C-alpha cells in the first residue's frame, strides 16, 4: 500500500469513530504483486501482531504495570500491525528504543504519558525479540500557558532557557518534585 492509500484508510477510520490502525489490506499480496510493488518502491516492514500473539501464546489483552498509574491494559486487536522499519530502511523510533534499551541494559523508562500507546507496541517487540522489558513510568505532561504540550522544538523548555529567564535551580527542582 502506498502512504497515500494508508492515510486515506486511517482518515476513513477516524471519520467512522474508530481507532486508526493498519487494516492488513496489503498483507495478503501474492508474490507477483509484491515483486511489482518492489520495482516501484521499497516496502516498510511491519510486525504481524496477530501472528506474534498466536506464536507466543500471548493473551488477547496486554497489561503492563505502570509505576505511576498501575495496571494499564489494551486489547491486542486495537493495535494492528505496525511499521518496524520504514521504506527508507530506517527503524521507527520505538523499535530503535527497544534495541537501545536492551543494549544499554535500561531497567526503567520514565517518559510522558503521551507514550502510553507506544508502550504496547514496544512490549510486543520485546516479546518478539525475547527481551525482558524494563519497567515503565508515565508522567503527566508539562504544558505551556496555552495548554499545548511543552516541546523542545518550540524553545523555552530547556534548563538553560529557565536559567536565562532568572529561575533559580532550587525553584526548578522544587517545581518538578511537586508535579
What are these regions (language model features)?
Residues 154, 158-179:
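A conserved active-site cap/scaffold subdomain adjacent to cofactor or substrate pockets
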Amino acid at each position: 500500500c502506498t502512504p497515500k492509500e494508508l492515510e486515506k484508510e486511517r482518515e476513513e477510520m477516524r471519520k467512522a469513530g474508530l481507532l486508526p490502525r493498519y487494516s492488513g489490506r496489503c498483507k495478503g499480496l501474492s508474490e507477483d504483486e509484491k515483486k511489482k510493488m518492489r520495482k516501484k518502491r521499497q516496502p516498510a516492514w511491519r510486525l504481524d501482531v496477530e501472528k506474534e500473539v498466536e506464536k507466543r501464546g500471548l493473551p488477547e489483552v496486554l497489561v503492563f504495570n505502570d509505576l505511576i498509574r498501575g495496571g494499564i491494559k489494551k486489547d491486542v486487536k486495537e493495535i494492528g500491525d505496525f511499521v518496524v522499519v520504514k521504506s527508507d530502511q530506517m527503524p521507527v523510533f520505538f523499535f530503535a528504543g527497544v534495541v537501545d534499551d536492551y543494549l544499554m541494559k535500561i531497567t526503567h523508562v520514565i517518559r510522558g504519558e503521551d507514550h502510553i500507546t507506544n508502550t504496547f507496541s514496544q512490549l510486543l517487540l520485546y516479546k518478539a525479540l525475547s527481551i525482558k522489558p524494563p519497567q515503565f513510568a508515565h508522567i503527566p505532561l508539562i504544558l505551556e500557558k496555552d495548554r499545548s504540550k511543552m516541546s523542545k522544538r518550540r524553545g523555552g523548555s530547556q534548563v538553560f532557557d529557565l536559567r536565562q529567564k532568572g529561575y533559580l535551580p532550587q525553584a526548578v527542582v522544587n517545581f518538578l518534585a511537586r508535579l
